[in-house]
C-alpha cells in the first residue's frame, strides 16, 4: 500500500515536470519566433491610432540629415503638399533646431499617435524597396535577350492586356520593346520596385525607366509559392533568398515560377535623374516611405522604431529611431505596413531585400 502511494506521488511529480518542460519549450519558441523579426509585446492597443502623451525613448534620431533633405524636396517639388502639412513640419523643425530629446516632442505641441500594428500590440510591418540598376542593350545580342516592354498601344483603356506567360512567349510585337536585359529575374525585380535605371554600358549616362501601366491581371506572390513548395522557409523569405533560389535553378524553372504571377508591369523611358514617388516628389533614401494611403495620408510624418540588422540581415535585438515621410504607395502595401525607401543600386537592394520585420510607429500631428 505504501509503495503504491509512493509510486503515484512519483508519477504526479514526473507529470508536473513534463508539463513545466513543455510550457518552457513553448514559451522559448514563441518568444524566439516573435522577436527575431523585431516584434515587441507591451500594451495592447484597441484603436487604429492611440494618442500617447509621452514616450520614454532615449535613442537619438539616426536620419536627421536625410529627413531635412526630404523636407526640402517636398518644399521645392510639391509646394501644395508642403503647405498642407506646414504646421507639423514647422513644429518638427523647431524641435530639431533645439536638439531636444524624443521624449520632449510634447513641449513643441507635437502629438504622438501610436499605430496599433498588425496585431494590436503596435507591431507595424516594415519592409524595404529600392531602385535597381539593370544592365541592358538596345538590341538583342549575346546574353541580352530578355525584353523590357513599353505599354502596347493597340488595347482599349480597361482591357486586360496579355498575361505574363503570353508576353514571355512573344505575344507582343517587337516595336514595344524598350531594351533587352541579361536577366529575367532582374526585369521582374524592376517590376516589383516599380522603376529602375538602365545601364547601357560604355560609361553612358543611366536612363530612368519609370512605371507606365500594369496588364490588369491579378498579382501572385512568388515568395508565397516558394514557401508553399517548401523551397524557402517562411521566416527566411526575402528578395535576397528568392534571388539565391534563382542562382540554383535553370532559366526554364525560373520562368515557370515567374509565370505563376500573371501580373506584368510596362515601363516608359524618362529624362528624370531622380526617383520620384507617387507624390511627384524625389525620394530620399531612409527618409521616404510607401504607405497605404487609406491608413496614412501622403505627406504625414511618422516616427518609427526600426530593427537594426547585421550584414547578413539578422536582427541584432537593437532598434534605431527614424523620422519618415509618407511620399509613395505600393500595390502590396496594405494596412499597418511601411515600405522604407533604401536608395539606388545593389547595396540598397541587398538591404531592402533583408527587411521583413516589425517596429513601433507614431504618427506626428499638431
Swiss-Prot record:
GO terms for molecular function: hydrolase activity, hydrolyzing O-glycosyl compounds; peptidoglycan lytic transglycosylase activity. Its EC number is 4.2.2.n1. GO terms for cellular component: outer membrane. It holds the Pfam family MltA. One of its GO terms (biological process) is peptidoglycan turnover. It catalyses: Exolytic cleavage of the (1->4)-beta-glycosidic linkage between N-acetylmuramic acid (MurNAc) and N-acetylglucosamine (GlcNAc) residues in peptidoglycan, from either the reducing or the non-reducing ends of the peptidoglycan chains, with concomitant formation of a 1,6-anhydrobond in the MurNAc residue. Keywords: Cell wall biogenesis/degradation, Lyase. Gene3D superfamilies: Barwin-like endoglucanases, RlpA-like domain. Murein-degrading enzyme. May play a role in recycling of muropeptides during cell elongation and/or cell division. This is Membrane-bound lytic murein transglycosylase A homolog. It comes from Buchnera aphidicola subsp. Schizaphis graminum (strain Sg). The lineage of its organism: Bacteria, Pseudomonadati, Pseudomonadota, Gammaproteobacteria, Enterobacterales.
